[in-house]
A protein has these predicted regions:
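HAD-like aspartate-dependent phosphatase fold
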Residues: 1-178
Length: 178
């Protein structure tokens, strides 16, 4: 559910760890976000997300810095600025709907939890009164079902291993995986 890096960045990270990987081996909540935006014909957004996330959206023809966005898109933005949050808030006050890449409240770190997308969703609700109309990523079963189909498998032939019951295991249950 981490949308802070692009697929290319994750492949490089895995390779540095000695794990060979190709881009099609990596599945991110950003993929689910892009699929949802495309299904809903959204190509003008204001994205609160990292450069890696914005590059993935832009590569799919989705503008991420529109002055007249169809949606404010919220990802795990480890590079955010007050100005970015302010612009997103103003769009939300103007009636632009909000969608998010995933619901996680906390991103674990060795030194303690860090604010993740869910925490920023709470911030926007508190400051603008706006709640997300859609949240992509886990626990949405669509996050994994398209990959299962692409691999020619059935959900009941797949098992999920994860560290969070409310995202990883909930998604597996909703997708009818083991």
């Amino acid at each position: 559910n981490n949308s802070s890096r692009s697929v290319e960045q994750y492949v490089k990270k895995l390779e540095k760890m000695g794990i060979p990987a190709a881009e099609n081996d990596v599945l991110l909540s950003t993929h689910d976000c892009i699929a949802w935006l495309n299904r809903n014909n959204v190509n003008e957004t204001y994205c609160v997300g990292t450069e890696g996330m914005r590059q993935m959206l832009e590569a799919e023809g989705i503008s991420t810095r529109s002055t007249q966005p169809q949606y404010v898109v919220l990802g795990y933005d480890t590079e955010t600025t007050y100005e970015r949050l302010e612009k997103a808030s103003l769009h939300l006050h103007a009636g632009v709907p909000l969608m998010a890449s995933h619901p996680d409240m906390v991103c674990p770190s060795p030194d303690g939890g860090l604010p993740d997308v869910g925490a920023f969703l709470a911030l926007f609700k508190a400051t603008t009164g706006v709640e997300a109309t859609h949240i992509s990523g886990k626990p949405n079963p669509g996050m994994i079902l398209h990959k299962i189909e692409e691999l020619g498998l059935k959900p009941e032939e797949c098992a999920m291993v994860g560290d969070r019951l409310y995202t990883d295991i909930a998604m597996a249950n909703r997708a009818n995986c083991m």
